[in-house]
Amino acid sequence: MTRGTLNFVTSPMNAGKTANMLLRARHAATLGRRVLLAKPLSDTRHESSVIRSRCGIEMKCDLCAGPEFSFTKDVLYGDVDILLVDEAQFLSSRQIDELREVADVHGIPVWCYGLLTDFKKNLFEGSKRLVELCDKMIELDIVCYFCKADGRFHLKYANGKAVVEGPSIDISIPGDGKFVAVCHMCWTEKTSTSEEVQDPRVLCAKVIPVDR
């Protein structure tokens, strides 16, 4: 049996994680591999039947995983060659354990894409468990909105001011409307002053054109 792997691709918002995942899915499909695309039910930015990147690439979502969903009990993997999971930071530790089991027992590659930390610099539950269990972790680069250094952290703003309070999971409006990627020095500076953030816009990674 082919040995499966659990892989974690992570970056701050707008570095191209979902686009990267969908490009991987399309490439796998062109090679005749049977692809299963999944995302958490808590990702309500788009309809549950679609996974869509900010650059416009989209594909059909095969399953949405709610809190009680089991990747080991609720899915038959006989016709699956590769499993790709978007927004994996929203999964529970148990579900990440199950994805590890899927890779080991069924011998298929599992690719999880998601944020590493929230805007308070705390690991998400799913991301923490992925770091502990994954075979390979890949970080996509994005630059700091303010100084153009590596932007590994998130700055959340409300009414033009940086904030460090509130729930870690906040999808009331699209994430690129309230978060920017920043370096640690800029995160510290902006959260320790009352300076207003003018026209906050995230700098996106370079997008590769794809025929739709």
From Swiss-Prot:
Its EC number is 2.7.1.21. One of its GO terms (cellular component) is cytosol. Keywords: ATP-binding, DNA synthesis, Kinase, Metal-binding, Nucleotide-binding, Transferase, Zinc. Pfam families: TK. InterPro entries: P-loop_NTPase, Thymidine_kinase. GO terms for biological process: DNA biosynthetic process; thymidine metabolic process. The active site is at residue 87. It is an enzyme of class 2 (transferase). GO terms for molecular function: ATP binding; metal ion binding; thymidine kinase activity. Zn(2+) binds at residues 144, 147, 183, 186. It catalyses: thymidine + ATP = dTMP + ADP + H(+). Substrate binds at residue 119. ATP binds at residues 11-18, 43-45, 86-89. Belongs to the thymidine kinase family. PANTHER family: THYMIDINE KINASE, THYMIDINE KINASE, CYTOSOLIC. This is Thymidine kinase. It comes from Encephalitozoon cuniculi (strain GB-M1). The gene is TK.
